[in-house]
């Protein structure tokens, strides 16, 4: 009897032992599966967060890996990249120290508490003596973005060209969008350190580079006989590429405007072309503010009337900044095809980042960007159907003391106009995150408050919390202009009296209400004081500017005849 009980007990114990071994084996297999599955997730750039409501620190720190420079004008086919290595980052650091010493030596009498802040932040958490090897820590969130199914540049660019050439036909084309949206890792713009880090990445693109011969030509197609000549590298756009340790998140920072007379600018900077592209993207019609201004394109027809098709063609010209920014993105995508790419930039760089981000459905954080919504519409960039633009992955961060960001730096007496900038737009796409420093700190509205390091040291690092992002207020740019599609004649100007009246009419081509100024009944003639146009019967002798100085005044003209339509 005892023997039978012992046998049963031994049998149960062996069964229990085998069961434990089976459970242990299954647990080991499960851990192996989870381990390899998590590797797959990392390779696909999908980051799993422990808390869905709070941003999590992304794996690995972000460092500068590549610097792009892209030519414009005659050198618009040329693009080069500089890979950051230990050797050249040390050399760049020594150059930065020399530049800082030079600035300190010339800073006598300048109204600045710390000369370093004009070249880099003086905040203790981010201070460094070498911006080229600084390690950034960023947080991210998961967000559903509505993006096109096919976002390959080989599809996007021909579609945009078609939409610009035949907007009516393009409106009938159905674009495939990802059904229900797509989960994408986006910057956590509620985290102060992340916002400051992205702003510093934007400022990094302004830091001057010493001469080096380590640039690689990545132009497509590349032809050694097709060289732009001397000086192209200081006459274009720059993009700085930051990558984390796992190479699954990439941040592209696009350089903004270099303004003559501001710290960090000079003859080796891109002042002239920056101003041309500013005036092309953010003016109502080719920077035609008054008859005293020389236009940056030939689309102005008459008073408050502009050739819309001509304007759209001018913005998309291959030798301008928008195309150059897209080329920088395309080569970065070629190097990191499986990474999630973010865009950032300050001022003009922020606007270009926003335009490229909307083109390819990329998360974008722009700082102090002028209103770019009008430029996005003129470029016929894709907007998700039925989804308001503010519900997308684009954030515009700025403050109330910056007239460029707020859209108030216009008019003949404004500082922008005096400096030769026609900043006439104020409407942003995406969401706006505004610091009210006028109310909170008593700041005065001043164009000098537009500088990136004023924003970083005076606002972003001083506030305890980041600004709340919200949908922009209803906004219409250039409401008093008539934009005529190609082939359409401007309406004759008639009225019952010789006094000037203001009438409200609707223009179908732009699908918005415009205010048109009507004068007495007679054939329109150009202002005799305007040197840019001369009318002969049904033809107009027009002049186009070939070269400008930094103020924007034309120094060389070319003339041509244009038939009135």
From Swiss-Prot:
One of its GO terms (biological process) is piecemeal microautophagy of the nucleus. It is a single-pass type II membrane protein. It catalyses: a triacylglycerol + H2O = a diacylglycerol + a fatty acid + H(+). The keyword Phosphoprotein does not apply. CDD domains: Lipase_3. Residues 43-565 are lumenal. The chain crosses the membrane at residues 22-42. Keywords: Autophagy, Endosome, Glycoprotein, Hydrolase, Lipid degradation, Lipid metabolism, Membrane, Signal-anchor, Transmembrane, Transmembrane helix. The keyword Phosphoprotein does not apply. Residues 1-21 are cytoplasmic. Glycans are attached at residue 217. Pfam families: Lipase_3 (PF01764). GO terms for molecular function: phospholipase activity; triacylglycerol lipase activity. PANTHER family: LIPASE ATG15-RELATED (PTHR47175:SF2). Binds to both phosphatidylinositol (PI) and phosphatidylinositol 3,5-bisphosphate (PIP2). This is Putative lipase ATG15. The gene is ATG15.
């Amino acid at each position: 009897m005892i023997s039978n009980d012992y046998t049963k007990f031994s049998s149960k114990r062996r069964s229990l032992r085998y069961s434990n071994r089976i459970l242990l084996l299954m647990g080991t297999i499960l851990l192996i599966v989870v381990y390899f599955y998590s590797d797959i997730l990392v390779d696909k750039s999908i980051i799993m967060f422990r808390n869905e409501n709070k941003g999590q620190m992304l794996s690995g720190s972000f460092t500068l890996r590549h610097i792009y420079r892209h030519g414009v004008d005659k050198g618009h086919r040329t693009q080069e990249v500089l890979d950051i290595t230990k050797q050249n980052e040390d050399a760049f650091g020594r150059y930065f120290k020399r530049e800082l010493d030079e600035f300190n030596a010339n800073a006598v009498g300048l109204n600045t508490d710390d000369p370093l802040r004009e070249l880099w932040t003086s905040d203790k958490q981010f201070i460094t003596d070498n911006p080229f090897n600084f390690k950034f820590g960023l947080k991210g969130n998961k967000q559903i973005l509505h993006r096109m199914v096919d976002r390959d540049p080989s599809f996007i660019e021909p579609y945009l060209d078609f939409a610009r050439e035949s907007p009516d036909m393009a409106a009938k084309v159905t674009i495939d969008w990802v059904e229900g949206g797509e989960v994408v890792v986006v910057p956590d713009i509620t985290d102060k350190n992340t916002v400051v880090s992205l702003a510093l990445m934007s400022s990094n693109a302004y830091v001057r580079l010493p001469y080096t011969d380590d640039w690689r030509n990545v132009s497509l197609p590349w032809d050694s006989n097709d060289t732009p000549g001397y000086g192209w590298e200081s006459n274009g756009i720059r993009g700085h590429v930051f990558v984390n340790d796992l190479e699954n998140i990439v941040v592209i920072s696009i350089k903004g405007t270099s303004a003559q007379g501001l710290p960090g600018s000079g003859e080796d900077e891109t002042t002239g072309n920056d101003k041309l592209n500013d005036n092309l993207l953010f003016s109502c019609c080719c920077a035609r503010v008054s008859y005293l201004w020389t236009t940056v394109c030939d689309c102005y027809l008459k008073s408050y009337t502009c050739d819309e098709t001509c304007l759209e063609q001018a913005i998309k010209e291959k030798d301008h900044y928008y195309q150059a920014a897209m080329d920088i993105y395309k080569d970065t995508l070629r190097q990191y095809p499986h990474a999630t790419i973010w865009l950032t930039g300050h001022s003009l760089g922020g606007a270009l980042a926003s335009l490229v981000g909307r083109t390819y459905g990329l998360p974008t954080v722009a700082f102090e960007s002028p209103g770019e919504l009008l430029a996005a519409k003129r470029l016929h960039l894709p907007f998700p159907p039925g989804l308001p633009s503010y519900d997308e992955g684009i954030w515009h961060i700025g403050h109330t003391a910056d007239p460029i960001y707020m859209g108030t730096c216009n008019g003949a007496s404004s500082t922008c106009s005096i400096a030769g900038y026609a900043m006439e737009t104020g409407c942003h796409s995406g969401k706006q995150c505004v610091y009210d420093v006028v109310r909170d700190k008593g700041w005065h509205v001043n164009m000098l408050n537009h500088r990136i390091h004023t924003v970083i040291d005076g606002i972003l690092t001083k506030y305890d919390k980041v600004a709340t992002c919200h949908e922009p207020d209803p906004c219409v740019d250039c409401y008093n202009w008539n934009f005529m599609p190609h082939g359409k004649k401007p309406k004759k100007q008639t009225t019952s009296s010789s006094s000037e009246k203001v009438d409200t009419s609707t223009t179908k081509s732009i699908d918005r209400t415009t205010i048109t100024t009507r004068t007495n009944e007679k054939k329109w003639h150009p202002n005799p004081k305007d040197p840019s146009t001369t009318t002969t019967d049904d033809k107009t002798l027009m002049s186009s500017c070939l070269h400008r100085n930094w103020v924007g005044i034309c120094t060389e003209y070319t003339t041509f005849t244009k038939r009135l339509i």
